[in-house]
A protein has these predicted regions:
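Carbohydrate-active enzyme catalytic cores, enriched for enzymes
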Residues: 243, 284-458, 519-523, 527-529, ...
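Short hydrophobic alpha-helical segments enriched in small aliphatic residues
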Residues: 9-12, 31, 39
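Aromatic-lined, polymer-binding surfaces characteristic
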Residues: 74-84, 88-91, 97-328, 335-336, ...
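Bacterial N-terminal signal peptides
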Residues: 36-49
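CBM-like, beta-strand-rich accessory domains located in the C-terminal region of large
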Residues: 76, 370, 469-650
């Protein structure tokens, strides 16, 4: 058994128990014989539905002992030779695997004509180059393992050798080192027996010196509580385990460091799986988190309880929860609204036996990606796509998401989700945001919302501003102080979000809006207390109610305003506003309509506000968008109430 296993006897015994008790899985039929079944299970060892309680951190000696039992042969990262053989057999018969291999081989062929990457910095970052190398190496190495074309192997080797010649991998921005290290680790490991000894030694020396040992000198990321910890520990872990026979003590040290520090980043998932940095960074942090766990389980035979940490299993539902029926995400914080395929979602679907996680949005994103045939791999290519092949599984017809219709995330950056149905692409969907602008990648967006209906995204979040363009001007993008340059950027300010602006002033950067109450059920309701992010009101409460007739009511209650101050209610849209602007505003897009009715005052005059053209030369344009809204002046009482009813289809 050890000869075909990815890991030591611990993992083999666990998989033996799974084989004995498992129900028939159609995917397993592609792997004939007991060895084939074990190969697939071991290849996807992280798929075992084990979320046992995490004990205390393991000692360095315990990690070193586990490493001494690790398989000595290459390949060993994510799969051994038998695992790759099983994957190759699956790719010939399984629908998803066949589609994935088609895209993979296409991309690998396109890479043959491209020159290797060079050490070209973008401002303070080498990250774009590291990501390109990771995409190329993982794609070419996987293509060679599954397709056997020597040209893919040779081009992969050339890409890796070019990276070894860089003066360094830019350790001052350690994400760059981490992604480059993951790239060379998998290329070195997966192609080990097909590389000549001199090439292996060159790659190993660069991985050791520019990756692993550099991580002992540049340590600012080691105890990170955000995605840096997940990405950097995964990259360093891959490098150390690929080179374990060259320095076993160092490999054990790096593994132990990852095991005891990853929980710092993983606290973000507690208690219910929401990610404070938004769905875009969920993909980044969670994909690499999954890679780290898969590396530990595959080589050391255990994840040492990491997958049992609070909220981690629950985060499997997060991508679906924050994706509206339009297919766009609730893209709070720095991120785009598109839904891309994620290897982490496939990993969770296997581990938890949850095909419903793939039922709609992930399956569609995956098949869309597989079907595309770009002329050349660009920066938007999915650099971790090759890893997805390890965790593909069937999705039975008729499978639908089983996440709740109404959800309050709790946690440090609370959001609420309300929708009328999962199995109807015209369903109503609303995401509301609380929390603090000073959260990681935060915006001044407390109280902001997105809204889908009739298959259309009506209320938008404009998303992130490009980092390099801001940094190249010398602006301080990463300070959350009240006077920070960050809040001068339109997309990050309260002026661009679907929330209230009082007296033209920004929200309080250190304030923290909370979800006061949340009611589930057919008429779900979220009550957000926004008072802590405003200095110019004694009470600001926003209530969102999903009504039985398929409409949505958003109510704002304000007190303690200075008499005469102006309050603006706003919503960014790509729809065309109708000509009637008193009391009711009709939006139309693609033959669909949404009516906004000012219930609080039928004399309310709806206005439009410029969002498409940049306000400042550092702001990006937001083509095709406009903000609709209205204004009200605080009376002598200092109290205002707004109530807007959203009615789809009229």
């Amino acid at each position: 058994m050890r000869s075909i296993g990815l890991v030591h006897a611990f993992c083999v015994r666990r998989c033996n128990r799974l084989v004995a008790g498992m129900r028939e899985d159609r995917a397993l039929l592609h792997f004939r014989g007991a060895a084939g079944v074990h190969a697939l299970l071991l290849l996807a060892c992280a798929a075992a539905p084990l979320f046992a309680q995490r004990a205390a951190d393991p000692t360095p000696d315990a990690v070193a002992a586990a490493l001494r039992q690790a398989p000595p042969a290459h390949p060993r990262l994510f799969a051994d030779a038998a695992g790759f053989a099983a994957l190759k057999e699956s790719a010939a018969a399984d629908t998803f695997a066949r589609a994935a291999l088609g895209r993979l081989l296409h991309d690998a062929d396109q890479m043959l004509a491209l020159p290797p990457n060079t050490r070209k910095m973008e401002g303070r970052r080498l990250l774009g180059v590291s990501r390109s190398v990771l995409h190329r190496v993982s794609t070419l190495a996987m293509a060679y393992r599954l397709g056997g074309n020597p040209a893919h192997r040779d081009r992969c080797a050339a890409e890796m050798l070019a990276a070894t010649a860089f003066t360094d991998w830019n350790p001052s921005h350690f994400l760059d080192v981490a992604e480059m290290s993951l790239a060379l680790a998998v290329g070195y490991d997966w192609l080990y027996h097909d590389l000549d000894p001199a090439t292996r030694d060159t790659l190993a020396a660069a991985l050791m010196e520019k990756g692993v040992r550099t991580s002992l000198k540049h340590t600012g990321w080691v105890k990170a509580s955000n995605n840096w910890g997940q990405v950097c520990h995964a990259g360093m872990l891959a490098a150390a385990l690929a080179l374990q026979e060259r320095d076993e003590a160092l490999a054990a040290q790096i593994a132990h460091r990852a095991i005891v520090n990853l929980p710092r980043s993983m606290r973000a998932f507690a208690p219910k799986g929401c990610y404070p940095e938004g769905p875009g960074y969920w993909s980044y942090g969670t994909d690499f988190n999954v890679l780290a766990i898969a590396l530990l389980e595959g080589v050391l035979g255990s994840d040492f309880g990491l997958a049992a940490l609070p909220g981690f299993a629950a985060t499997a539902d997060y991508p679906d929860l924050v994706t509206g029926p339009s297919g766009m995400t609730f893209n709070y914080a720095d991120g785009g609204m598109g839904r891309d395929t994620d290897c982490a979602t496939w990993w969770f679907a296997r581990r938890l036996d949850r095909p419903d996680l793939l039922a709609y949005f992930e399956k569609e994103a995956f098949l869309r990606y597989c079907a595309a045939r770009p002329a050349a791999p660009g920066r938007r290519a999915n650099r971790l796509f090759a890893f997805t092949l390890f965790w593909l599984r069937p999705v039975p017809e008729g499978t639908v998401p089983r996440a709740p219709l109404a959800w309050h995330s709790e946690g440090p950056v609370p959001i609420t989700i309300q929708r009328t149905a999962w199995d109807n692409r015209t369903a109503l969907f609303v995401g509301l945001k609380a929390g603090s602008p000073s959260a990681p990648h935060g915006h001044m967006d407390a109280g902001s919302f997105v809204l889908d209906a009739e298959g259309i995204r009506w209320a938008y979040d404009l998303g992130a501003e490009g980092y390099h363009g801001i940094e190249s001007r010398g602006m301080n993008l990463w300070s959350s102080a009240q006077t920070s340059d960050r809040w001068r950027i339109f997309r990050l300010s309260s002026h661009s979000h679907n929330t209230l602006v009082i007296d033209g002033q920004p929200q309080l950067a250190k304030g923290n809006a909370v979800v006061r109450s949340f009611r589930e059920g057919p008429e779900s309701e979220a009550v957000l207390d926004l008072t802590p992010v405003y200095t110019n009101a004694s009470k600001v409460v926003r209530t969102g109610t999903l009504l039985a007739g398929g409409t949505y009511r958003l109510t704002d209650t304000l007190e303690g305003l200075r008499p005469g101050v102006t309050v603006r209610w706003g919503m960014v849209t790509r729809a065309a506003p109708g000509p009637e602007r008193t009391g009711t505003l009709a939006l139309s897009e693609a033959g669909k309509r949404l009516r906004l009715s000012a219930l609080h005052d039928p004399a309310t005059v709806w206005k439009t506000y410029e969002t498409a053209r940049p306000l400042n030369d550092w702001d990006s344009p937001n083509k095709g968008t406009v903000m609709v809204g209205f204004e009200a002046v605080a009376p002598a009482s200092g109290a205002l109430t707004f109530s807007v009813l959203f009615t789809p289809g009229t």
